[in-house]
């Protein structure tokens, strides 16, 4: 998934991301995907994440919503079905990360040793991932049914979740270079790493390209 399926959810009096300037935004914990998404999303709208908003770790989704109800925070972030549940509480979705920029927070990870010793196994997993993503994109009803059974949620929530994340999925598992670079820079910031980190230090897309060719997918 080349884009983060994370939504910025606010109390109803806030009509735009810009209105969060000077406010407190709740996240689950520091050092994770929600903190990164919060920083990148407000920055996209011209807000300095270091000076013009305050991030507050308020725990799991239920606690984050409680903090908003109590007026301790103006907004929070979360992946579906957080946006669906937030709307049920009367909150509003101001922005979705995958609609603003590429920021891959999920993918296939393997050690260098594994890549060298078992490339065919990795390629099979990648092909399965491509096929599953294509099923997800092309088969709405089948996917929603699977979600109700696997996630143990009702159809309304499954449908809302599907619609929220659909555009974030890639039909060939391609990873945009700008998204990977953004991910690296954010990881460097969190880990306080100052040296340059080349993309080939953290990503090997050669097996993905091979899998795409074997499936007849044109290179982008």
What are these regions (language model features)?
Residues 19, 25, 99, 120, ...:
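Short capping/connector residues at structural and topological boundaries
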Residues 117-195:
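Secondary-structure end/capping motifs
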Residues 14, 47, 153, 192-193, ...:
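Helix N-cap/coil-helix junction residues
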Residues 60-151:
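Pocket-lining segment of extracytoplasmic ligand-binding domains
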Residues 41, 85, 146-147, 186-187, ...:
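Residues within well-ordered alpha helices
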Residues 188-220:
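Conserved C-terminal helix/tail region of periplasmic/extracytoplasmic solute-binding proteins
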Residues 54-56, 160-166, 197-209:
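Short linear loop/turn motifs
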Residues 1-60, 64-67, 74-80, 92-97, ...:
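Short, glycine-/small- and polar/acidic-enriched structural segments
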């Amino acid at each position: 998934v080349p884009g983060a399926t994370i939504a910025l959810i606010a109390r109803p009096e806030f009509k735009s991301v810009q209105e969060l300037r000077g406010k407190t935004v709740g996240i689950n914990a520091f050092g994770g995907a929600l903190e990164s998404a919060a920083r990148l999303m407000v920055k996209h709208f011209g807000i300095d994440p270091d000076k013009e908003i305050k991030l507050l770790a308020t725990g799991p989704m239920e606690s984050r919503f409680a903090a908003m109800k109590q007026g301790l925070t103006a907004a929070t972030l979360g992946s579906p079905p957080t946006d669906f549940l937030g709307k049920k509480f009367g909150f509003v979705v101001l922005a979705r990360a995958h609609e603003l920029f590429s920021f891959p927070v999920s993918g296939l990870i393997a050690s260098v040793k594994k890549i060298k010793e078992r490339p065919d196994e990795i390629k099979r997993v990648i092909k399965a991932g491509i096929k599953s993503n294509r099923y997800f994109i092309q088969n709405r009803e089948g996917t929603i049914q699977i979600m109700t059974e696997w996630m143990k949620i009702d159809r309304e929530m499954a449908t809302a979740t599907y619609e929220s994340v659909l555009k974030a999925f890639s039909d060939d598992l391609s990873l945009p270079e700008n998204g990977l670079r953004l991910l690296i820079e954010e990881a460097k910031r969190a880990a306080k790493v100052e040296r340059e980190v080349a993309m080939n230090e953290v990503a090997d897309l050669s097996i993905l390209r091979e899998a795409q060719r074997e499936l007849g997918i044109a290179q982008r």
